[in-house]
Amino acid sequence: MKGLVSTGWKGPVKFRMPTAENLVPIRLDIQFEGQRYKDAFTWNPSDPDNEVVIFAKRTVKDLKLPYAFVTQIAQSIQSQLSDFRAYEGQDMYTGEKIIPIKLDLRVNHTLIKDQFLWDLNNFESDPEEFARTLCKDLGVEDPEVGPAVAFAIREQLYEIAIQSVASARESRLSKKGRRGSDHGSASKASGLSMDLMKLFSFKSSVVRKRKDLDVYEPVVDLLTSEEVDALEAREERHAR
């Protein structure tokens, strides 16, 4: 499956999302004048900045939000894009890094929990395609679940990519004074990656069989309206 085949690239690369499409995960949670707007989507950092304001105006119009939300939405998107762009041009070190991705999401009435391995070094990976296949294999019918799964994957990959910038910086400093020690650390990391690859075959279906570790078995539940109302009430209390 696309996104789960190791490329074998070990050297540092310039910072970007470790996926085929370099898209920034944007999350909005804005409260203003007694109303709340929440959304999550991806944004191409190469798009012109004026697209942000256009998007904010269109969103406010479509959702009939107070016009003051335009500034709030635009500023939040711009701030997150600026954070991403601050890393562009810096080296990030991925090495042979097979990482666990964890899902714990509720989308409408669907609750989905899963954990699987992802090759951070595969820059041809496609979270959206992976999410579509996952939902198909699990029999998930709600069309909003797939995009939410893909977004959750991208958010985690983004955080790890940021950490990889720090790793590249530390690696450069270490090589100046402790080359022997670096070699040992790299060997251990490589060995761990290979051990994980032996345990989990990336050629298998997204749905894990029962013979695999229980922690890697996906769980999908359909919640009742009462359960959803209770969860939303709890989320509202935590948001205050």
UniProtKB/Swiss-Prot annotation:
BP term (GO), one: chromatin remodeling
Top-level division of the source organism's lineage: Eukaryota
Localization (cell): Nucleus
UniProt GO cellular component terms: nuclear chromosome
Tissue specificity statement from the Swiss-Prot or TrEMBL entry: Expressed in roots, stems, leaves, flowers and siliques.
Primary residence: nucleus
InterPro entries: SNF5 (IPR006939)
UniProt keyword annotation of Transcription regulation present: yes
Family as reported in the entry's similarity comment: Belongs to the SNF5 family.
The protein's role, per its UniProt record: Component of a multiprotein complex equivalent of the yeast SWI/SNF complex, an ATP-dependent chromatin-remodeling complex, which is required for the positive and negative regulation of gene expression of a large number of genes. It changes chromatin structure by altering DNA-histone contacts within a nucleosome, leading eventually to a change in nucleosome position, thus facilitating or repressing binding of gene-specific transcription factors.
Leftover remarks: Was named BUSHY by PubMed:10325430 because antisense transgenic plants have a 'bushy' phenotype.
Record text on subunit structure and interactions: Interacts with SWI3A and SWI3B, but not with BRM.
Protein name: Chromatin structure-remodeling complex protein BSH
The species this protein was found in: Arabidopsis thaliana (Mouse-ear cress)
Organism lineage string: Eukaryota, Viridiplantae, Streptophyta, Embryophyta, Tracheophyta
Gene label: BSH
